[in-house]
Amino acid sequence: MSTKDKLNLPPKRTINTRLSTPVHIPPPINSESTRITPQHGSPPRFGDHRISAAQGLFQRRRNARKIDHPLGWFLKNRHAAAHIPQRTTKTSQKLVLLPENHAVNSFNEEESNYEDLLTPSDAYNLIKLENLPRDKREELGFPRATAYCVCEAFQLPKVKHFLKHYHKVRAKKYDEVLYAVYHLPLVYGRSESCRVSSGPAPDDMPSSASNHNQKHLDSDKPDNENFDSHIISQLYRISEIFVFSYGVVVFWNFSLSQEKDILADLTFGGDNSLMVKPLAEEECEIEDLHFHYAPNTKRPRIYNDMIHIPSADNKMKLAMSHALAQSVKLSRFELRTDVTMNSALFYPKKLALYGHLGLSRVEVVRMSGHLFQLRVDVNLISNILDTPDFLWDSEPLLLPLYTAFREYLEIGPRTNVLNRRCKVIFDMLDIFGKSSADRKMNSITWIIIILISLFVIIFTLEVILRLRWAHR
């Protein structure tokens, strides 16, 4: 059997996961009678009767083919492999406005005025889309913004070389991040070392689509009717990836199957040397949201894990990707802290009930070593959670956007909780150390007592013998 058969690779052909024209999705009656009727229309805009067109444009992922590969557990057993980050915005539906060039302002849902954010005709449709459940948004195929923590670190020079020669994309480095653009639809890899690669850039793709879009959005009164719909439709044919040196990959506008394929290439490609200490399946962390290009939005915003951005500016996505990557990395340490503390909670209770741990010195040292290793890792992650130097030095205008996104992901409060748990770990280390020292001191004390007793016995015997010898 050949290597290709072992990998279960389908025949080489184009993966058409992006429809060129929007489709209309009629209300489902049952699983057998549901049909998809293609209709030609304008690209997605949220106003009047354009909601069906938006749903149709995102319909391409419903028909995307699921490919079996070594990372199939990301799809088949996702809840077992991925741990939801411990943040309340998963369920609280908090609204945060993402600033562009001014200070950060965050609002709760009751405090927000939707008419200040959108035109009145578009406000209702936006609220309706934002309140859709996550599963419904996934079913409709809304673009995904997903972060995966899959290893301890990436070898960025090797990853850059791999993406260039196998995925046919040019990667640009921003300090500790690699940024690459993929053109959709993706095609199957040209060799057995990779599963997919970037599709060819279309001839009608403008060289400055992002700049053109941003220029129009910067105008005081954007003309919705004259807006270049072709530019907007092209934005959904571009996907972006950010690879962070501390073991996190952030995907923008990839389907779930495409994300798995690229992760499989990064895991098993390049002679397995792209990653440092790959994580086991149950240790991998995922942070997934959805986003939408909303040219009529006066300010970018995030609500109910739905991001609305007015343009495809890669610097804006870079700032948000930094926050996403830090959140998923923090989630990994939250999980490790929970597992370690749960395994050690029994011993303080036992110490309180019986006055001793009931462990050998080797077991106590081993437990202390686990806790101390976690303490060291938490101290190391404090450097990762700092504001990236790139934002301080090169793009200071993106700091408010990065700060607002961190606020939504609750990185600050979660870090404080992690630090408090570390203090508990320090106390447990101190207790274990004192218990081990007390046990050792007790052993030394008993040895001294026994030696003194032996000395007294020997001295007594010597005195008795001398007295008997003197009487003779």
Swiss-Prot record:
Subcellular location: Nucleus membrane
Region (Disordered) residue spans: 1-47, 197-223
Chief location category: nucleus
Parts of the chain on the Lumenal side: 1-443
Bias (Polar residues): 30-40
Keyword Methyltransferase on entry: no
Membrane topology: Single-pass membrane protein
Single GO cellular component term: mitochondrial matrix
Modified residues (Phosphoserine): S42
Keywords: Membrane, Nucleus, Phosphoprotein, Transmembrane, Transmembrane helix
A single BP term in Gene Ontology: mitochondrial gene expression
Segments on the Cytoplasmic face: 465-472
Subunit comment: Interacts with sad1.
Protein name: Sad1-interacting factor 3
Organism whose genome encodes this protein: Schizosaccharomyces pombe (strain 972 / ATCC 24843)
Gene expressing this chain: sif3
